[in-house]
Swiss-Prot record:
One function term, GO molecular function aspect: structural constituent of ribosome
Source organism (scientific name): Prochlorococcus marinus subsp. pastoris (strain CCMP1986 / NIES-2087 / MED4)
Keyword hit for RNA-binding: yes
Gene: rpsQ
The protein's name in its UniProt record: Small ribosomal subunit protein uS17
GO terms classed as biological process: translation
Subunit structure: Part of the 30S ribosomal subunit.
One Pfam family named in its UniProt record: Ribosomal_S17
Family of this protein: Belongs to the universal ribosomal protein uS17 family.
Role according to the record: One of the primary rRNA binding proteins, it binds specifically to the 5'-end of 16S ribosomal RNA.
A GO-annotated cellular component: cytosolic small ribosomal subunit
InterPro entries per record: NA-bd_OB-fold, Ribosomal_uS17, Ribosomal_uS17_bact/chlr, Ribosomal_uS17_CS
Signal peptide: none
Length: 88
Protein backbone atom coordinates (compact mmCIF):
# COMPACT_ATOMS: atom_id res chain seq x y z
CA UNK A 1 0.00 0.00 0.00
CA UNK A 2 1.38 3.40 -0.97
CA UNK A 3 1.90 6.03 1.70
CA UNK A 4 -0.60 8.86 1.54
CA UNK A 5 0.46 12.51 1.40
CA UNK A 6 -1.57 15.62 2.14
CA UNK A 7 -0.92 19.38 1.93
CA UNK A 8 -2.43 21.61 4.61
CA UNK A 9 -2.04 24.51 7.00
CA UNK A 10 -0.83 24.36 10.61
CA UNK A 11 -3.72 25.47 12.84
CA UNK A 12 -2.22 24.60 16.25
CA UNK A 13 1.35 24.27 17.51
CA UNK A 14 0.73 24.23 21.27
CA UNK A 15 1.80 20.62 21.82
CA UNK A 16 5.39 19.42 22.14
CA UNK A 17 6.64 17.76 18.92
CA UNK A 18 3.08 17.72 17.54
CA UNK A 19 1.15 20.10 15.28
CA UNK A 20 -2.44 20.04 14.06
CA UNK A 21 -2.71 20.37 10.28
CA UNK A 22 -6.00 21.31 8.60
CA UNK A 23 -6.44 19.80 5.13
CA UNK A 24 -9.25 21.08 2.89
CA UNK A 25 -10.83 18.51 0.59
CA UNK A 26 -13.04 19.86 -2.21
CA UNK A 27 -15.44 17.57 -4.07
CA UNK A 28 -18.73 17.92 -6.00
CA UNK A 29 -21.91 17.07 -4.12
CA UNK A 30 -23.27 13.79 -5.54
CA UNK A 31 -26.79 15.13 -6.22
CA UNK A 32 -26.49 18.90 -6.57
CA UNK A 33 -22.99 19.07 -8.13
CA UNK A 34 -22.04 22.09 -6.01
CA UNK A 35 -18.39 22.09 -4.92
CA UNK A 36 -18.34 21.27 -1.20
CA UNK A 37 -15.36 21.90 1.08
CA UNK A 38 -14.63 19.56 3.98
CA UNK A 39 -11.84 20.32 6.47
CA UNK A 40 -10.05 17.43 8.17
CA UNK A 41 -7.64 18.01 11.05
CA UNK A 42 -4.64 15.69 11.36
CA UNK A 43 -2.20 15.52 14.29
CA UNK A 44 1.29 15.30 12.78
CA UNK A 45 4.70 14.60 14.31
CA UNK A 46 7.10 17.58 14.25
CA UNK A 47 10.32 16.33 15.92
CA UNK A 48 12.19 19.68 15.85
CA UNK A 49 9.17 21.87 16.74
CA UNK A 50 9.96 23.83 13.57
CA UNK A 51 6.37 24.51 12.43
CA UNK A 52 4.47 27.59 13.58
CA UNK A 53 0.87 28.67 13.19
CA UNK A 54 -0.03 29.37 9.56
CA UNK A 55 2.75 27.34 7.90
CA UNK A 56 1.83 25.44 4.74
CA UNK A 57 3.18 21.89 5.12
CA UNK A 58 3.22 18.51 3.41
CA UNK A 59 2.45 15.57 5.70
CA UNK A 60 2.86 11.87 5.03
CA UNK A 61 1.26 8.81 6.56
CA UNK A 62 3.39 6.83 9.01
CA UNK A 63 3.05 4.14 11.64
CA UNK A 64 1.01 5.02 14.75
CA UNK A 65 3.18 7.27 16.92
CA UNK A 66 0.62 7.79 19.71
CA UNK A 67 -3.10 7.35 20.30
CA UNK A 68 -4.02 10.01 17.71
CA UNK A 69 -0.83 10.63 15.67
CA UNK A 70 -0.56 8.76 12.35
CA UNK A 71 1.09 11.50 10.24
CA UNK A 72 4.53 13.17 10.13
CA UNK A 73 5.73 16.47 8.68
CA UNK A 74 7.59 15.75 5.44
CA UNK A 75 8.47 19.34 4.47
CA UNK A 76 7.49 22.95 5.13
CA UNK A 77 6.30 24.51 1.87
CA UNK A 78 5.63 28.12 2.99
CA UNK A 79 7.04 29.45 6.26
CA UNK A 80 5.01 32.05 8.18
CA UNK A 81 6.82 34.81 10.04
CA UNK A 82 5.14 35.25 13.42
CA UNK A 83 5.73 38.20 15.72
CA UNK A 84 5.61 37.90 19.51
CA UNK A 85 2.25 39.72 19.64
CA UNK A 86 0.72 37.23 17.19
CA UNK A 87 1.95 34.25 19.26
CA UNK A 88 -0.03 35.37 22.35
Amino acid sequence: MALKERIGTVVSDKMDKTVVVAVINRYPHPTYKKIVSKTTRYKAHDPENSCVLGDRVKIKETRPLSAHKRWAIEEILNKTIMSKEDKK
